[in-house]
Swiss-Prot record:
SMART domains: eIF3_N (SM01186), PINT (SM00088). This is Eukaryotic translation initiation factor 3 subunit E-B. Keywords: Cytoplasm, Initiation factor, Nucleus, Protein biosynthesis. The gene is eif3eb. PROSITE patterns: PCI. GO terms for biological process: formation of cytoplasmic translation initiation complex; translational initiation. It comes from the Eukaryota. Belongs to the eIF-3 subunit E family. It is found in: Cytoplasm; Nucleus. Component of the eukaryotic translation initiation factor 3 (eIF-3) complex, which is composed of 13 subunits: eif3a, eif3b, eif3c, eif3d, eif3e, eif3f, eif3g, eif3h, eif3i, eif3j, eif3k, eif3l and eif3m. Its main location: cytoplasm. CDD domains: eIF3E.
Length: 446
């Protein structure tokens, strides 16, 4: 379903190495011409040192042609450069492999003290850090992400936050952990990078906006694979004003992922309040971005159009199954979306026939009754079934005045943030800069 594919938009904000998994996914889904995807891979690989991979792609794309001499020459050059960097880095790596050095690294949190220890015991010098950084980048360019992550960890421990390569190394470490699918380490790196960006007083507002936009896109890999990711994405994208502002200004298509995280959230009480806030954002941005997922939310919670919501839900299945980040959410999404339709419909009608409900949920009456019984049994629904009449009767959940005051206060606070963001959006014009390509940079992203 190429109509709703966001790969091109998202790739604009990713390092080229992070785009490869997306292209592999599209290749499996067969929604694009395979030759076009292979050409896209080859174009991306031309700026990396993954020459063997590039040769394989070239063979698949042009099975009747010989491998170009330029690729063979590049391979020779890359191997020579790798050997040179290995020889330069070998004494540095041996320092870090020393058991006493490893104990010092585990016990010492201060990079300056550790640097002084290495300088005293191993004659460590400042230029070694630059060598280590270059070697880490080269390993990354070659597709050796585990080596890159290891050397970037050493680099990060030793350099101060003011170092010209400090921020760039954080991006590289995050990318490496993502590509190795080390989600715990990636979440830690994501948090560290976010803190660095948010506490940066040197960058201009535009640079900070660009950095946050990149972080939002890179974080999708982590949030939709880490066990706590769907909670964290809501907190960051919806309730952190600077990041919500970045989404509204630079990348409203991210609302697809925020909406999916909200709909699939397992905390029922939290989900209801979050949905209210999400609906406000979707309404506000509907003129800049919409797809079946955001339209489903709008049909159900703004227009109360259950027939349209049901149609959009069927479209959502096609969107989810063809989205690299969301395909694993499909079952949770459909289950919870049906629950939302059911709850909203019953909240309006209070009493409803099971046969009518089955029609709204695209189920048989027997399936619908079993589904409702399971909801009641699992305490996810306050309702009773009248089997004789074939009706479902909703319970009456009274909300305390205290809770009403809290919700109204939250709503006012949220609306104030939205108003401030709208003013800021009108003052500053968005400027989409090129994506950070960590491996091709020498001095970070600026």
């Amino acid at each position: 379903m190429a109509e709703y594919d966001l790969t091109t938009r998202i790739a604009h904000f990713l390092d080229r190495h992070l785009v490869f998994p997306l292209l592999e996914f599209l290749s499996v889904k067969e929604i694009y011409n395979e030759k076009e995807l292979l050409q896209g891979k080859l174009d991306l690989l031309s700026e990396t040192n993954m020459v063997d991979f590039a040769m394989d792609v070239y063979k698949n794309l042009y099975p009747d042609k010989e491998i170009p001499h330029s690729l063979r020459d590049k391979r020779t050059t890359v191997v020579a450069q790798l050997k040179q960097l290995q020889s330069e880095t070998e004494p540095i790596v041996k320092m870090f492999e020393d058991p006493e050095t490893q104990r010092q690294m585990q016990s010492t949190r201060d990079g300056r003290m550790l640097f002084e220890y290495l300088a005293d015991k191993h004659s460590f010098r400042q230029e070694y850090l630059d060598t280590l950084y270059r070697y880490a980048k080269f390993q990354y360019e070659c597709g050796n992400y585990s080596g890159a992550a290891e050397y970037l960890y050493f680099f990060r421990v030793l350099v101060p936050s003011t170092d010209r390569n400090a921020l760039s190394s954080l991006w590289g470490k995050l990318a490496s952990e993502i590509l190795m699918q080390n989600w715990e380490a990636a979440m830690e790196d994501l948090t560290r990078l976010r803190e660095t960006i948010d506490n940066n007083t040197v960058s201009s507002p535009l640079q900070s906006l660009q950095q946050r936009t990149w972080l939002i896109h890179w974080s999708l890999f982590v949030f939709f694979n880490h066990p706590k990711g769907r909670d964290n994405i809501i907190e960051l994208f919806l309730y952190q004003p600077q990041y919500l502002n970045a989404i509204q200004t630079m990348c409203p298509h991210i609302l697809r992922y925020l909406s999916t995280a909200v709909i699939t959230n397992k905390d029922v009480r939290k989900r209801r309040q979050v949905l209210k806030d999400l609906v406000k954002v979707i309404q506000q941005e509907s003129y800049t971005y919409k797809d079946p997922i955001t339209e489903f939310v709008e049909c159900l919670y703004v227009n109360f159009d259950f027939d349209s919501a049901q149609r959009k839900l069927r479209e959502c299945e096609s969107v989810l199954v063809n989205d690299f980040f969301l395909v694993a959410c499909l079952e949770d999404f459909i289950e919870n979306a049906r629950l939302f339709i059911f709850e909203t419909f019953c909240r309006i009608h209070q009493c409803i026939s099971i046969s009518m409900l089955a029609d709204k949920l695209n189920m048989t009456p027997e399936e619908a009754e079993r589904w409702i019984v399971n909801l009641i049994r699992n305490a996810r629904l306050d309702a009773k079934i009248d089997s004789k009449l074939g009706h479902v009767v909703m319970g009456n959940n009274a909300v305390s005045p205290y809770q009403q005051v809290i919700e109204k206060t939250k709503s006012l606070s949220f609306r104030s943030q939205m108003l401030a963001m709208n003013i800021e959006k009108k003052i500053s014009h968005s400027n989409r800069n090129e994506t950070p390509n960590w491996a091709a940079q020498d001095t970070g992203f600026y």
